[in-house]
């Protein structure tokens, strides 16, 4: 992608910083090139000789391209059924350089097809068993599930019970290898009721975190494409916090492509790139304001600017003001059903109109 070749994005991770700097965000409207950048990053790690984009290590006096083992592994996460990018084959062998793992819907064995729910669940169980049979992974998984419990609906499913079911099943089937297909199928049948009770968003979070815990090592890079497409805001925030603390423990970093201001609330502006497209050229900018903990409405205006003012309820307010009516008349037209934000915007627009200023 020529547009991508002309831009530079810096990602600085500062040790023990508050707030944490191990989650970075690329934000912009649909079609601005965020997913293209992420896919270029995947190619830069998995196939560096045949790609335009490069990762550069800036920790030296003379900057240089990273070595093949700079990242221990790369994990890409995308549950979009419409992304034309075909993920590479998984590469789990550290002797060949950075390992590569994919979390998502694409079926790499059957081009242009998606994985079924039974296939996704079978893959989840395989990685869940991997977490349960290794003490260090089990500790990470338990802690991740506990943190995700800040989302009440997630906690109510009782996913921490899965560990006890695994232990009981292993005790009953002592002669069965836990990594055998037979044991995994048996385990899946025992926990299926838990999985079917999950919403699609909760399933995606559980499957994603479990696979990440299963394969993550020191210095892992995680790339995630638009997680908000499937997650409501509290679950998105819980997921980002959980991921950040998991990466902190293992000296890893995540880069997330998003169009959700909710996600920006979880990261400082030094970790945010606004991506704008002008024709075929991509232009990255840092936000003008601090993003960590900022109001969603403020962040929306910061990122999308005029697009917000000319769309949705802003457009309706503008049209009502252009009709020449008074503030009180417009409130009556809307049967007193305007929120505080809409009323504030309406008042400002009317003041500007009556003074002969542009809105």
Locate the predicted segments by residue.
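Short secondary-structure boundary/capping segments
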Residues: 87-99, 270-273
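Conserved beta-strand segments of alpha/beta enzyme cores
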Residues: 73, 99-101, 253, 271
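AAA+/P-loop NTPase substrate/partner-engagement loops
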Residues: 52-88
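Switch/communication elements of ASCE P-loop NTPase nucleotide-binding domains
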Residues: 6-57, 65, 182-316
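RecA-like P-loop NTPase motor core
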Residues: 116-152, 245, 262-265, 270-359
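Extended helical coiled-coil dimerization/tether regions that scaffold
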Residues: 1-17, 68, 82-88, 101-203, ...
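Structural signal for conserved beta-strand scaffold positions within catalytic alpha/beta enzyme cores
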Residues: 76, 102-104, 274
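Extended low-complexity acidic/polar segments
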Residues: 40-44, 50, 92-114
């Amino acid at each position: 992608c020529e547009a991508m070749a002309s831009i530079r994005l810096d990602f600085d991770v500062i040790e023990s910083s508050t707030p944490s700097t191990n989650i970075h965000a690329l934000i912009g409207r649909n079609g601005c090139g965020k997913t293209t950048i992420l896919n270029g990053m995947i190619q830069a790690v998995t196939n560096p000789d045949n790609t335009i984009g490069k990762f550069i290590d800036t920790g030296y006096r003379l900057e240089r391209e990273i070595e093949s083992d700079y990242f221990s592994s790369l994990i890409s996460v995308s549950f979009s059924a419409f992304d034309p990018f075909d993920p590479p084959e998984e590469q789990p062998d550290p002797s060949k350089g950075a390992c590569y793992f994919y979390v998502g819907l694409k079926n790499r064995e059957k081009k242009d097809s998606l994985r079924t729910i039974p296939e996704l669940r079978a893959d989840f169980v395989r990685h869940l068993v991997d977490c349960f049979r290794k003490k260090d992974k089990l500790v990470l998984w338990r802690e991740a599930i506990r943190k995700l419990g800040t989302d009440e609906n997630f906690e109510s499913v009782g996913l921490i019970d899965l560990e006890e079911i695994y232990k009981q099943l292993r005790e009953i089937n002592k002669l069965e290898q836990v990594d055998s297909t037979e044991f995994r199928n048996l385990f899946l049948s025992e926990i299926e009721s838990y999985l079917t009770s999950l919403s699609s968003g909760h399933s995606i979070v559980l499957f994603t975190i479990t696979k990440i815990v299963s394969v993550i090592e020191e210095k892992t890079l995680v790339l995630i494409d638009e997680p908000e497409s499937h997650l409501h805001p509290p679950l998105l925030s819980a997921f980002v916090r959980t991921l950040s603390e998991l990466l902190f423990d293992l000296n890893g970093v995540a880069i997330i492509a998003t169009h959700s201001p909710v996600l920006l609330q979880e990261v400082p502006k030094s970790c945010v790139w606004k991506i704008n497209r002008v024709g075929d050229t991509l232009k990255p900018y840092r936000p003008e304001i601090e993003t960590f903990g900022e109001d969603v409405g403020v962040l929306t205006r910061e990122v999308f600017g005029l697009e917000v003012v000319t769309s949705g309820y802003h457009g309706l307010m503008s049209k009502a003001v252009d009709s020449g009516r008074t503030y009180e008349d417009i409130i009556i037209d809307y049967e007193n059903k305007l929120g505080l934000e809409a009323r504030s915007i309406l008042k400002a627009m009317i003041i500007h109109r009556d003074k002969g200023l542009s809105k």
